[in-house]
Amino acid sequence: IGPRPGDSYPADPVWCAHLGARVPLLEVLCAGARPLIFVDTLCQDSASAQPMIDEFRRCAVAAGISPDAVTGSTEDNVVTTQTGIGVTIIGVIPDGDLPKALDGDIVVCVGAPISAPDDDVTPDRPEIVTLDEVRALMASGKVHDCVPVGSHGVAWEAEQLSSTAGLRIESQHTDVNLTRSGGPSTCLVLACASGNVEELCGLVAPERPWAVIGHLSSVV
């Protein structure tokens, strides 16, 4: 995926870099961790990779990482014809405990699942939750647990969130496609107290999809 001769799916290199960065960044942020170091590995020469490296720095800053803590490597020894991106994020959980949902929590899908090639995944799509929004949600102290949605879909991630807490999810009717791939984590699933749903909704853009998909209860 990218603009190079050997790529099978054409895409803007800067947007490729953004999507390549956002997935691991969201995993770290949603785990309640503070990302500290951003490491990229690119399978092309440094000159052609520079726009992607610049985007990595922008993503790092959006996630709370200093631009000086962005490092990585390019391939300048041999000629390559395809885009290849690797990203590693190192972070720390301040209190050492992973977040966990609570009995009675409301489960919300923030954003909506979209994925190429079925969808045109472009920067202006309102379905895509932003790094800034995820930071604000997690910094609120009112999100009990949160998981990015990948190729398994919303329902699968919601089940992972509930089972990790030893709970079960009671689903409710929603227009959200619960089985569709979330591609590059265009949306996320979070758990919070019912009284905090409205306040948390105010931390994301008004056009961002926000849907209650169920609630959590004890396993009988």
Regions found by a protein language model. Give the residues of each.
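Glycine-rich phosphate/pyrophosphate-binding loop regions near the starts of catalytic domains
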Residues: I1-M52, R57-I114
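Electropositive phosphate-/nucleotide-binding environments in soluble metabolic enzymes
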Residues: D7, A11-R22, S46, Q50, ...
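Short hydrophobic/aromatic-rich motifs at helix boundaries and adjacent loops
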Residues: E27-C30, E127-D132, S171-Q172
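Active-site-proximal beta-alpha loop/turn segments in soluble metabolic enzymes
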Residues: F38-L42, I114-D119, L178, S185
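Glycine-/charge-enriched secondary-structure boundary and capping motifs
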Residues: E55-S66, T80-T81, A139-H144, V149-V220
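A generic local structural motif
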Residues: S73-T74, D132, D175-N177
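Conserved mixed alpha/beta catalytic, RNA-binding, or beta-rich assembly cores of soluble enzyme
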Residues: G84-I89, D97-S140, H144-S162
